[in-house]
């Protein structure tokens, strides 16, 4: 009995130590989550400004042509896949890879993995990888996004790939994060006046990027900004050159926003997972403590009984 009680006591201490770790990770994830959502929101003005400029150029030039708006010359796909650097985030990483498996089925795929888990996953599954230079999503900054965008644009313009898409995790709420994909190249939402919403932050705030069709600017003001005002703009050396030079910057802004949204999603998933782990640890400690106290009480009762029996026998 004594040995059993000692084992239970050690088990309680072990669970308490684990609970301290999970609670600390929960608090850290919650703190970082606020910063990640703010970074995604702060990237919105830059992205929207470039989007409006590209849309204006495409709209004001009927004979406009760009290698980035034409359909690819082949059926090869490049996927930029954003995953996490660590585990302990519920199904965050597994959901991304499962989604990508369904999305890329039957396609000639090359990936550009972002995040340690993404690099490890595709290396293990022997999927062609464009580069492993961006293995730590937490260390990626704006300059890295510009480098990735230039690399992708050069590969697409050179005919290496016919389609480029970005797989990231959308932040819907603290409880829900869903993997999704958005097409990067060829560009299509600039020739379509209505466009479409590319991504949303959900509870984190407003859309990190919107097309002009989803803009909250009144229709009359849109006409002024995208119509008469833009007709006075002179692009040097020409609008097509300006458009092509802006595209990499536009994609870099989109990529940076998506990375921050994915990081926010990972942190939310980790916070919820650690909260659940902490709750489970508390329940386990309560159960073990109850068992320990009962065993201790039984041991004391047995000792008293033995003493009384000995006294009566004497």
Name what the model sees in each region.
Residues 1-314:
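C-terminal beta-strand-loop-alpha-helix "lid" module of Rossmann-like NAD(P)-dependent dehydrogenases
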């Amino acid at each position: 009995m004594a040995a059993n009680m000692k084992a239970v006591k050690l088990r309680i201490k072990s669970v308490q130590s684990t609970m301290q770790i999970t609670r600390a990770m929960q608090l850290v994830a919650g703190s970082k989550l606020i910063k990640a959502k703010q970074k995604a929101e702060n990237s919105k003005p830059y992205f929207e400004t470039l989007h409006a400029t590209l849309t204006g150029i495409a709209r004001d030039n009927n004979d406009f042509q760009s290698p980035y708006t034409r359909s690819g010359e082949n059926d090869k796909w490049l996927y930029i896949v954003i995953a996490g650097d660590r585990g302990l985030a519920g199904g965050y990483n597994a959901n991304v890879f499962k989604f990508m498996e369904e999305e890329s089925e039957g396609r000639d795929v090359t990936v550009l993995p972002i995040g340690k888990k993404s690099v490890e996953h595709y290396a293990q599954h022997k999927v062609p990888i464009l580069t492993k230079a961006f293995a730590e999503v937490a260390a990626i900054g704006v300059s890295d996004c510009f480098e990735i965008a230039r690399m992708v644009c050069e590969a697409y313009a050179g005919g290496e790939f016919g389609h480029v898409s970005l797989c990231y995790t959308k932040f819907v709420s603290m409880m829900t994060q869903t993997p999704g994909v958005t097409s990067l190249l060829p560009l299509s939402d600039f020739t379509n006046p209505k466009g479409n919403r590319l991504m949303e932050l959900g509870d984190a705030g407003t859309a990190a990027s919107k097309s002009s069709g989803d803009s909250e600017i009144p229709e009359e003001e849109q006409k002024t900004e995208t119509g008469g005002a833009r007709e006075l703009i002179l692009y040097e050396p020409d609008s097509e050159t300006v458009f092509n030079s802006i595209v990499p910057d536009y994609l870099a802004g989109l990529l940076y926003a998506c990375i921050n949204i994915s990081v926010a999603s990972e942190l939310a998933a980790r916070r919820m997972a650690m909260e659940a782990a902490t709750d489970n640890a508390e329940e386990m400690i309560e159960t073990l403590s109850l068992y320990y106290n009962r065993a201790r009480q039984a041991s004391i009762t047995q000792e008293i009984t033995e003493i009384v029996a000995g006294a009566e026998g004497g």
